[in-house]
């Protein structure tokens, strides 16, 4: 009996040992790396990555702190919606109905086309208005047409204008040049020009003027050639107050003397073809001051006059050059 029990116990031990050996072989086969198995050993460059590295435990508890995406998510703004107020039909009608006391304003034009010329037409239909310049040349005008307030340059040459009235240029504070060449102007009112603060150039050749009006102090260029101007028609000291006068052209008139005194700003004086026979010793120079010089006055024309310039040698000592004229 004991022998049979020993044999049965031995067989059980052998079965368990065989079973354990088979299980060990299976486990070794499963754990042994096969050829081409990329999961057993990964070669990346000079580094070998093993599956065992993936056994590292990663703590995900602090991911919320490490990656805070709150700034990238736009904040939703909630605003209150206001419902449109209901308007009654009577209020709508009241808004659309005009008051019977209201009158529609008619636009006024104070610009170029609002001024009427002597032909009964707007000035800028008879003349040509370009910017602030008005061109009325050869337009059969008999007087100065009403001009736009912004007029800076006026050209009304070769017309039939005979008189300049006191209000012809009223309010034209920006008027810088007036050219009335080739008209029939015989008189200019004393108030027509003197109140023009910006006037610099006054061009009046080929007219019938016997006298000069009062001139504004800002005049720089004065051309009154080919008129009927007489010495008696020029007021005493008419030019001395013109501190900016540089060019004075009085040729081809009826002057019998040189008008003076002349402003120190003068650069050019044309008096040819008049009736001048004599001059004062201080016409150009201050005889009381022998160091006096007038370097700017380089152009004096007295040719075409009966005066003998050699009779007045003391009259030229301050000039940079002698006048042009008769010396014998």
From Swiss-Prot:
Alphabetized UniProt keyword annotations: Disulfide bond, Extracellular matrix, Glycoprotein, Leucine-rich repeat, Repeat, Secreted, Signal, Sulfation
Disruption phenotype: Increased organization of cartilage collagen fibers featuring more smaller diameter fibers that are closely packed. Dysregulation of small leucine-rich repeat proteoglycan superfamily members in cartilage, including an increase in Lum and Epyc, and a decrease in Fmod and Prelp. In a surgical osteoarthritis model, a reduction in cartilage degradation and inflammatory markers, decreased loss of cartilage integrity, and reduced synovial membrane thickness. Decrease in vitreous body vaso-obliteration upon hypoxia, and an increase in preretinal neovascularization upon restoration of normoxia.
UniProt PTM comment: O-glycosylated.
Subunit comment: Homodimer.
Native species: Mus musculus (Mouse)
Modification type Sulfotyrosine: residues: 69
Domain (LRRNT) ranges: 112-149
Site keyed Cleavage: positions: 20-21, 30-31, 111-112
Record-linked Gene3D superfamilies: Ribonuclease Inhibitor
Protein name per the record: Opticin
UniProt repeat feature LRR, residue ranges: 150-171, 174-195, 198-219, 244-265, 266-286, 296-316
Glycan-modified residues: 46, 80, 101, 308
GO terms, biological process: angiogenesis; collagen fibril organization; negative regulation of angiogenesis
Role this protein plays: Inhibits angiogenesis in the vitreous humor of the eye, and therefore represses neovascularization. Binds collagen fibrils. May be involved in collagen fiber organization via regulation of other members of the small leucine-rich repeat proteoglycan superfamily.
UniProt note on tissues of expression: Expressed in cartilage (at protein level). Expressed in the vitreous collagen, inner limiting membrane, lens capsule, trabecular meshwork, anterior surface of the iris, the area adjacent to the nonpigmented ciliary epithelium, and weakly expressed in the retina of the eye (at protein level). Expressed in the nonpigmented ciliary epithelium of the eye.
Paired cysteines (S-S): 285-318
GO cellular component, one term: extracellular matrix
Residues annotated as signal peptide: 1-19
Pfam families reported for this sequence: LRR_8
Membership in a protein family: Belongs to the small leucine-rich proteoglycan (SLRP) family. SLRP class III subfamily.
Compartments where found: Secreted, Extracellular space, Extracellular matrix
């Amino acid at each position: 009996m004991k022998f049979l029990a020993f044999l049965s116990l031995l067989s059980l031990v052998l079965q368990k040992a065989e079973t354990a050996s088979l299980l060990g072989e299976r486990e070794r086969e499963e754990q042994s790396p096969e050829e081409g198995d990329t999961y057993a050993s990964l070669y990346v460059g000079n580094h070998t990555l093993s599956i065992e590295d993936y056994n590292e435990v990663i703590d995900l508890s602090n991911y919320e702190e490490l990656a805070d995406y709150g700034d990238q998510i736009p904040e939703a703004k909630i605003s209150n919606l206001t419902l449109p107020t209901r308007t009654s039909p009577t209020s709508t009608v009241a808004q659309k109905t005009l008051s019977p006391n209201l009158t529609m304003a008619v636009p006024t034009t104070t610009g170029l086309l609002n001024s009427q010329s002597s032909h009964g037409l707007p000035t800028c239909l008879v003349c040509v208005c370009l910017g602030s310049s008005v061109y009325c040349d050869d337009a059969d005008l008999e007087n100065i047409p009403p001009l736009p307030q912004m007029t800076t340059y006026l050209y009304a040459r070769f017309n039939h204008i005979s008189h300049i009235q006191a209000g012809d240029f009223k309010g034209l504070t920006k008027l810088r040049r007036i050219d009335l060449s080739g008209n029939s102007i015989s008189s200019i009112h004393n108030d027509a020009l003197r109140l023009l603060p910006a006037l610099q150039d006054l061009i009046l050749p080929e007219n019938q003027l016997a006298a000069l009006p009062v001139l504004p102090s800002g005049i720089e260029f004065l051309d009154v050639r080919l008129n009927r101007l007489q010495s008696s028609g020029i007021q005493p000291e008419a030019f001395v107050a013109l501190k900016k006068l540089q060019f004075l052209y009085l040729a081809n008139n009826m002057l019998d003397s040189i008008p003076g005194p002349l402003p120190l700003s003068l650069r050019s004086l044309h008096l040819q073809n008049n009736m001048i026979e004599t001059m004062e010793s201080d016409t150009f120079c201050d005889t009381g001051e022998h160091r006096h010089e007038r370097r700017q006055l380089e152009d004096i024309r007295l040719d075409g006059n009966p005066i003998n310039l050699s009779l007045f040698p003391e009259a030229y000592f301050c000039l940079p050059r002698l006048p042009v004229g008769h010396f014998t």
